[in-house]
Amino acid sequence: MNWTAATCWALLLAAAFLCDSCSAKGGRGGARGSARGVRGGARGASRVRVRPAPRYGSSLRVAAAGAAAGAAAGVAAGLATGSGWRRTSGPGELGLEDDENGAMGGNGTDRGVYSYWAWTSGSGSVHSPRICLLLGGTLGALELLRP
C-alpha cells in the first residue's frame, strides 16, 4: 500500500471518529413526562428507563475500525517488504504478466488499467493528495453544517 492510500485511510478514520456524535439520543427524546410540571408526568408514577449500552457502538465506528485495521496491515506489509511488494523484472527478464500476454491467444491487456499490478503496486502514476484533502474537508464541512 502506498503512502497516498495510507493517508486517505488515516483521514477517513479520523473523520469517522470526529464526525460520530457521542451525544446523540435515541428514542422519542426530551423529558416527556416531567415537562408538564407534575412529578411523574401524566401517568402519576415516575418511570425509570434504563437503556443498555450498545454492544459494538455505532456502525460507523465498526467500519472505521475495520478500515484502520486494513490500512495498518497494508502499511506494515509495505514497510516489511520495502517500497514495493513485488520485485520488478529487469531488462530481458519476463515477468508474471508478460507470459500471459506473449502467449498465443493472450488477453492482451498488458500493464494498463486492467492490470492487478498497476492497481496494487507503489510504482506507476503518482496521484496527488488533493482527493484526500477534498474528502477530509467535505466530511468536516458536513459535520459543521449538521443541526
Curated annotation (Swiss-Prot):
Mainly expressed in brain (at protein level). In brain, it is highly expressed in the hippocampus and cerebellum and is also expressed at lower level in other areas of the brain including the cerebral cortex, the thalamus and the medulla. In hippocampus and cerebellum it is highly expressed in the cell bodies of pyramidal cells and Purkinje cells, respectively. A lipid is attached at G122 (GPI-anchor amidated glycine). Residues 26-45 are annotated as: Disordered. Its main location: membrane. One of its GO terms (biological process) is protein import into nucleus. Prion-like protein that has PrP(C)-like neuroprotective activity. May act as a modulator for the biological actions of normal and abnormal PrP. This protein is a candidate for 'Pi' factor, a PrP(C)-like protein able to compensate for the absence of PrPC in mice lacking Prnp. This is Shadow of prion protein. It comes from Mus musculus (Mouse).
